[in-house]
Swiss-Prot record:
Location of the GAE domain: 742-841
Name of this protein: AP-2 complex subunit alpha-1
Localization per Swiss-Prot or TrEMBL: Membrane, Coated pit
Topological type in the membrane: Peripheral membrane protein
Cystine crosslinks: none
HEAT repeat extents: 254-289, 354-391, 393-430, 525-565
Function according to Swiss-Prot or TrEMBL: Subunit of the adaptor protein complex 2 (AP-2). Adaptor protein complexes function in protein transport via transport vesicles in different membrane traffic pathways. Adaptor protein complexes are vesicle coat components and appear to be involved in cargo selection and vesicle formation. AP-2 is involved in clathrin-dependent endocytosis in which cargo proteins are incorporated into vesicles surrounded by clathrin (clathrin-coated vesicles, CCVs) which are destined for fusion with the early endosome. The complex binds polyphosphoinositides.
GO cellular component: AP-2 adaptor complex; plastid
InterPro entries: Adaptor_Complx_Large_Subunit, AP2_complex_asu, ARM-like, ARM-type_fold, Clathrin/coatomer_adapt-like_N, Clathrin_a-adaptin_app_sub_C, Clathrin_a/b/g-adaptin_app_Ig, Clathrin_app_Ig-like_sf
Segments crossing the lipid bilayer: none
Gene: ALPHA-ADR
Region spans: Disordered: 652-678
Compositionally biased residues, Polar residues: 663-675
Length: 1012
């Protein structure tokens, strides 16, 4: 820009403008002049074009829209001289975006500059592509940029720009960047001595491993060596040392890349990494210099994340928690925020919860911090660290904070307080007190689900009903109460107000009067609840009260002509029913007990907006089974269906006849066991509550009765197997068959849960090898003894289960790795024969292990040039099998494609000319066959989605048949009544039985024979 007098004068004129209008006039005048000059190309010299393009850029920087001259800017890129080319690249990257059509005109020029010998031109081109390159640039330039990155003849300046440029292209179009065999190249780049190239290459590595970490396992030790080099400050130039910290950016990137790898198997590499992490943890402290603080703590918090990922020794974990405890008490708000956030992440790690509790008082203090973001993190941490031991203190603090909290936080605060109060209630009266306080203090922010839930608890617990009614009566004495309190009080008093009849001020007439005082203040949706309450008060009035009847009838008559249909219908029907005497009592009998259902509040808590980026930690958190176990040693609630006992099945017993004997004609299960029902109150939280019409009979879909798991379930009709004679049952939390089927399509989750233990699985699959970890968590305050776990493997799998400890301590979790090797294709599954002793009973269960056929498939995307030659090369049967499948679940094509992708069979779009068909490919791995390409074609009928034609082809006849049958199983819903027993198809229900020496000495082979 040196010597451009016209540009300098224009900038001075703009700066000298007295107001915005004068500036606009000057800019418009200049834009008109530029437009005129661009039209007259004969007098437009390269100098003038360059000057006018600079002016356009300056006007753009001022915030004005520049909608012309883009072609002139792009044309400067092809100029042979550096000054014009520089202007072209700079202005183009500022004025245009990746989707602009003019950019396509410059692709060839940019490519020529990249592959040319002029390093200055290469840098300009790489900078442009790295800033605004899109999918078109990725398809055209990715191979050239890759060559430039690994070229030994290029200067480091060019190579580091090439690395960042390739990163941009990979993000925009991963398929266009050929990464086959690129792992070795990346490993070589990580040996680079120039820290600029190394930092850029590490940024590229983070993106690559986040997409596919398995291919880059050779880079793992290289990242550790980078950290060692920086930790020892070896060969680190001064320009890369920031306030005494060797290249903090590179340290953070290297540790972030390591977090995408599942484990570090090599002992020496693991030891070296832990030494580096220990040095970082010990060498970081809070100093006065803000810049140094920011850099050192960026490295530290990334190190903490890596420590959590690696499941380091307890001593290092304790050190991390102590360090975070120090950070949450410093004055610097940014460090406090990060300390709270990382302490919340630490809750995911086993055995550190008790250490975190030591900082509870400081965390509660953070709840009163002036910064709302810190208060939110403190709330999340308190919610995550809460258990039976500290629930009362935390919930009371949340209730106290509720009065002063911002309105934007109150809904989340109310939701979490309600969940904690229920989940860890020492007794139900305390839970009722908490919820009523919650409604009283923050009624506007208490969702209907919360008061529905307290009504459910009161309904299901007879001992709680008088207490809840008396508390509801107390709140009605307040001058001003929230409408939600009117709803819950009216409902409870209508159902159970008669239990207080002998207490002063609690007669039916007095309850009617105090409730009727609230009627003018409530909204239309609450009036139906009050009408129901009035009807019930009238019914419970003993002896009959003519005065009360007169008042209630007057209310009913008033609302008989209400415009609201619901109110009108209730008023008319209650009025007529109240005239029928004894029949009135039959119609308005006490509400039946509510079933336990899936928690709607838990879903709400999980859906609270999280603004964090998709880091490696967050991606892992979505895949890991939760370490938070539901506590089961609380006071039980009456009212859910009793556990169902399984009849003794002989070898000749027909399971379908058993299912019929257990079922009514309408499909509901008979209540065989007459014992008092007592499900676990805290087994699983909250479900939507239909107050006006709770079901009188509970279907098996809401409860999986132990011993009949799978009898009424259409997903798995073979879950009943011959079992030993039993005298007791243990209740099951969740559906075993549904849990197994879910784990067949994902790699982590809960396999089994009852009131005493929770068994989770986390798996990692690579080729024909798999590594599973069984997480067994004791949910009680008493130890589980005589714990035994035995694997019953099918012939096609080789399994090795690490020994399981004989005893699981209270509130503890143990882990047992399971190595799986696939020998040949088969759909059979392994079975875990698991048992433990709790108190005087032995509980046993046979559980299917989700090491299914699809776990040994690797997704593979093929182009038409790759697919069709392979498809034609596979001859007919038995390598290629075709079948018309009927009874298919009606799925739209996108849903079917998602289903295929979930079991690692990749849909190849655009290969079949018929839009109603799907073409798919994958690779199967086993020890005997190696890697085998698998191809499939699904032909659907838009007029009838319940049938399709499926063709599967592979290089192995057994694999073809097994894969075809597996896909068919995923597509078909087989009715329960027509399903036969399948070998090893269903888990045995958990059976609680008196300890018997003969039972404990059962032969594993006999167990397997019984299962089959």
């Amino acid at each position: 820009m040196t010597g451009m007098r016209g540009l300098s004068v224009f900038i001075s004129d703009v700066r000298n403008c007295q107001n915005k209008e004068a500036e606009r006039l000057r800019v418009d005048k200049e834009l008109g002049n530029i437009r005129t000059c661009f039209k007259n190309e004969k007098v437009l010299t390269p100098y003038k074009k360059k000057k006018y393009v600079w002016k356009m850029l300056y006007i753009h920087m001022l915030g004005y829209d520049v909608d012309f001259g883009h072609m002139e800017a792009v044309s400067l890129i092809s100029a042979p001289k550096y000054p014009e080319k520089q202007v072209g690249y700079i202005v183009t990257s500022c004025l245009l975006n990746e989707n602009h059509d003019f950019l396509k005109l410059a692709i060839n020029t940019v490519r020529n500059d990249i592959i040319g010998r002029n390093e200055t031109f290469q840098c300009l081109a790489l900078t442009l592509v790295g800033n605004i390159g899109g999918r078109d640039f990725a398809e055209s330039l990715a191979p050239d940029v890759q060559k430039l990155l690994i070229s030994s003849s290029c200067r480091p300046l060019v190579r580091k720009k090439a690395a960042l440029c390739l990163l941009r292209l990979f993000r925009k179009n991963p398929d266009a960047v050929n990464v086959d065999g690129w792992a070795d190249r990346m490993a070589q780049l990580l040996d680079e001595r120039d820290l600029g190239v190394l930092t850029s290459s590490t940024s590229l590595l983070v993106a690559l491993v986040s997409n596919n970490h398995e291919a880059y396992s050779s880079c793992l030790p290289k990242c550790v060596k980078i950290l060692e080099r920086l930790a020892r400050n070896q060969d680190v130039p001064q320009e890369y040392t920031y306030y005494g910290i060797p290249s903090p950016w590179l340290q953070v990137k290297a540790m972030r890349a390591l977090q995408y790898f599942p484990t570090i198997e090599d002992p020496s590499t693991r030891k070296a990494l832990f030494e580096v992490l220990q040095r970082i943890l010990m060498g970081t402290d809070v100093v006065k210099n803000v810049n140094k603080n920011n850099a050192s703590h960026a490295v530290l918090f990334e190190a903490l994340s890596l420590v959590m990922h690696l499941d380091a020794e307890k001593e290092m974990m304790s050190q991390c928690v102590a360090l975070l405890g120090k950070f949450i008490s410093v004055r610097e708000p940014n460090i406090r925020y990060l300390g709270l956030e990382n302490m919340t992440r630490m809750l995911m790690v086993t055995d550190v919860q008790d250490i975190i509790k030591k900082h509870q008082s400081q965390i509660i203090t953070s709840l009163k911090d002036p910064d709302i973001s810190i208060r939110r993190r403190a709330l999340d941490l308190l919610y995550g660290m809460c258990d039976v031991s500290n629930a009362k203190d935390i919930v009371e603090e949340l209730l106290q904070y509720l009065s002063t909290a911002e309105f934007s936080m109150r809904e989340e605060l109310s939701l979490k307080a309600a969940i904690l109060a229920e989940k860890f209630a020492p007794d139900l009266s305390w839970y009722v007190d908490v919820i009523l306080q919650l409604i009283d203090k923050a009624g506007d922010f208490v969702s209907d689900d919360i008061w529905f839930r307290v009504v459910q608890f009161v309904t299901n617990n007879e001992d709680l009903q008088p207490y809840a009614a008396s508390k509801a009566r107390e709140y009605l004495d307040k001058i001003a109460i929230h409408e939600t309190m009117v709803k819950v009080s009216a409902y409870i008093l209508g159902e159970y107000g008669h239990l207080l009849a002998r207490q002063p001020g609690c007669s039916a007439s007095e309850l009617f009067s105090i409730l009727h005082e609230k009627l003018p203040t409530i909204s239309t949706p609450t009036i139906p609840i009050l009408l129901s309450t009035y009807a019930k008060l009238l019914m419970h009035a003993q002896p009959p009260d003519p005065e009360l009847q007169k008042k209630v009838w007057a209310v009913f008559k008033k609302y008989e002509s209400c415009i609201d249909v619901e109110i009108q219908q209730r008023a008319v029907e209650y009025f007529e029913l109240s005239k029928k005497g004894p029949a009135f009592m039959d119609v308005l009998a006490e509400m039946p007990k509510f079933p336990e259902r899936q928690s709607s509040l838990i879903k709400k808590a999980e859906n609270v907006e999280d603004t964090a980026d998709q880091s490696a930690i967050k991606l892992r958190a979505q895949q890991q089974p939760s370490n938070a176990m539901v506590l089961a040693d609380q006071q039980p609630v009456n009212g859910a269906p009793p556990p169902l006992k399984v009849p003794i099945l002989s070898g000749s017993t027909d399971p379908e006849s058993v299912a019929r004997s257990l079922s009514h004609p309408n499909g509901t299960l008979s209540n065989i066991d007459p014992q008092t029902p007592s499900p676990d109150l805290l087994s699983d939280l909250l479900g939507p509550l239909a107050i006006e019409a709770p079901p009188g009979a509970v279907s098996n879909e809401q409860h999986g009765p132990v011993g009949a798991e799978g009898v009424p379930d259409e997903v798995d009709g073979s879950a009943i197997v011959p079992v030993e004679e039993q005298t007791n049952t243990v209740e099951l939390i969740g559906n075993i068959a549904e849990r197994f089927h879910a784990l067949c399509l994902k790699d982590s989750g809960v396999l089994y849960e009852d009131p005493h233990i929770q068994i989770g699985i986390k798996a990692e699959w690579r080729g024909h090898h798999g590594r599973l970890v069984l997480f067994m968590g004791n949910k009680n305050t008493s130890p589980l003894t005589s714990v035994q776990a035995l694997i019953l493997p099918p012939a096609h799998l080789r399994l090795d289960l690490s020994p399981v400890p004989d005893t699981i301590p209270p509130r503890a979790q143990v882990q047992s790795p399971l190595e799986v090797m696939n020998i040949r294709p088969s759909r059979d599954v392994a079975v875990l024969d698991f048992s433990y002793k709790f108190g005087a009973n032995v509980v046993s269960a046979k559980l299917r292990i989700p090491a299914t056929l699809n776990k040994f498939l690797q997704p593979l995307q093929l182009t038409s040039e790759e697919f069709f030659p392979q498809w034609r090369a596979i001859s007919g049967p038995p390598l290629k099998l075709q079948e018309v499948v009927r009874g298919v679940r009606p799925l739209a094509l996108p849903e079917m494609a998602n289903l295929f992708n979930s079991f690692h069979v990749t849909i190849c779009p655009g290969l079949d000319p018929n839009p109603n068909n799907l073409v798919a490919s994958t690779t199967f791995y086993s020890e005997s066959t190696g890697a085998i390409l698998c191809l499939a074609r699904i032909e659907t009928d838009p007029a009838d989605r319940t049938q399709l034609r499926m063709t599967v082809g592979t290089g192995d006849p057994t694999l073809t048949f097994e894969l075809k049958e597996f896909i068919k199983e995923q597509l078909i819903t087989v009715p329960m009544g027509s399903r036969a027993l399948v070998p090893a198809a269903g888990p045995a229900p958990p059976v609680a039985q008196p300890p018997s020496p003969a039972a404990l000495a059962d032969d594993p082979g006999a167990m397997l024979a019984g299962l089959l």
